[in-house]
Curated annotation (Swiss-Prot):
Its main location: cytoplasm. This is Translation initiation factor IF-1 2. GO terms for cellular component: cytosol. It comes from Thiobacillus denitrificans (strain ATCC 25259 / T1). PANTHER family: TRANSLATION INITIATION FACTOR IF-1, CHLOROPLASTIC. CDD domains: S1_IF1 (cd04451). InterPro entries: NA-bd_OB-fold, RNA-binding_domain_S1_IF1, S1_domain, TIF_IF1. Pfam families: eIF-1a. Belongs to the IF-1 family. The gene is infA2. Keywords: Cytoplasm, Initiation factor, Protein biosynthesis, RNA-binding, rRNA-binding. Component of the 30S ribosomal translation pre-initiation complex which assembles on the 30S ribosome in the order IF-2 and IF-3, IF-1 and N-formylmethionyl-tRNA(fMet); mRNA recruitment can occur at any time during PIC assembly.
Amino acid sequence: MAKEEVIEMEGVVNEVLPQTRFRVTLDNGFEITAYASGKMRKHRIRILAGDKVTVEMSPYDLTKGRINFRHKDAHQAPRPTVARRYN
């Protein structure tokens, strides 16, 4: 699939499903099932219910999508960092 055929939309995560899938309500009101992109999994970016995300969808199946960006909230408290100890 060529990159030009991808439809990008914004939405809000409603529910976290098993196997790293999410139920997302798009800005136009449709509800889809989406999964986190490989880069998000690689960098361990957490997606929680209520997060605003950008979703890529194929024009051939508009019920499934890939989350490729999680928007930061201005009023959201920063997440605590964990000090790592190496032996």
